Amino acid sequence: MKKIKTIVASVSLVIAGLLWLLTSPAQAATIKLTCSAKDTIGNAVKKLKPGDTLSVTGTCNENVAIPEETTRVVLDGQGKAAINGPDTSNPTIVVNGRGITIKGFTVTGGRDGIVVSRGGQAVIDSNTIQGTARFGVQVNQTSFAVIVNNTIQNNQGNGITIGGSSYAAIGFFTALDKTANPNTIQNNGQNGINVGRSSNARITGNTIRNNKLNGVMVNRASQADITSSTIDGNGMSGIDVSQNSGVQLGADKGTGIFESPNTTTTGNSQVGIRCTLNSSADGRLGTLNGKNGAKDFDSSCVDSLIEAPGV
């Protein structure tokens, strides 16, 4: 099987990144915050020290910026708090710091829901991210994110965008995981996931359905490893790979989350996987499908897929 070397390198980055994210000093504090016009997450973040957790309740009507100097902190909405970004020219949450965890919030409004940029590192866990003016989650400018256990839906653009030489682990924490921590990415106005501009992603165990364009688009000299995901009912193809890019759809054999192929139960509007403009696909086709068939490759593409469904 042809190997995608950038994916292997990216797995090492996942492990290294998580070691950074999970390292915290011994004297960590939990600070409680009930959002109000006076008591905001933005003000509280300025006072956090490495290892601290900000435990948030209520509805926070603000656009939150987590600056580069903020490291190794947790923002915890406990599954109840909401952050609504009133300024639609800026993200609801932007992360430039490292070792930042955002979990348990409903995130709405803003230009984008959560943006990790300028070398930021973040874990985005167990949030509902919806109703933004553009992307649900964006990772760009050589940044790194683990995106797990979220519902990302009803955003006007892509559910998740990875760009600018960045890397994302979508649906798992580390390459040692035996089970996925899946996201549901649905009903977004463009692609479910877009990996572009020389970026890499490993996408495992997610449900990616009913997005207006493709389930997953990989383009502009990018690579993605896409496995064990259900890719259903998208408005174009399940997976679209183009512009000198490549996808790896699991291994030739094996049943683990990183080896198993993807599935389609409700056909995508075009094909299961489409390939154009000097791109490639390797691994197992699984049951990826669309109303126009399983796949469509132009003459410039390299097709190394094993086509036996379900193997």
Q: How should these model regions be labeled?
A:
Residues 16-25:
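C-terminal segment of classical bacterial N-terminal signal peptides
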Residues 61-74, 83-121, 135-142, 162-165:
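Extracellular beta-strand-rich solenoid/capping regions of secreted or surface-exposed proteins
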Residues 1-12:
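Bacterial N-terminal signal peptides that target proteins for export
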Residues 63, 90-94, 113-115, 135-136, ...:
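Structural detector of coil-to-beta-strand junctions
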Residues 30-57, 61-65:
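Acidic Gly/Asp/Thr-rich repetitive segments characteristic of extracellular carbohydrate-active
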Residues 105, 127, 132, 150, ...:
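Consensus "Asn ladder" position of solenoid repeat domains
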Residues 33, 56, 66, 77, ...:
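Extracellular beta-strand solenoids
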Residues 74-77, 100-103, 121-125, 144-148, ...:
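All-beta strand scaffolds that present successive hydrophobic residues in beta-strands
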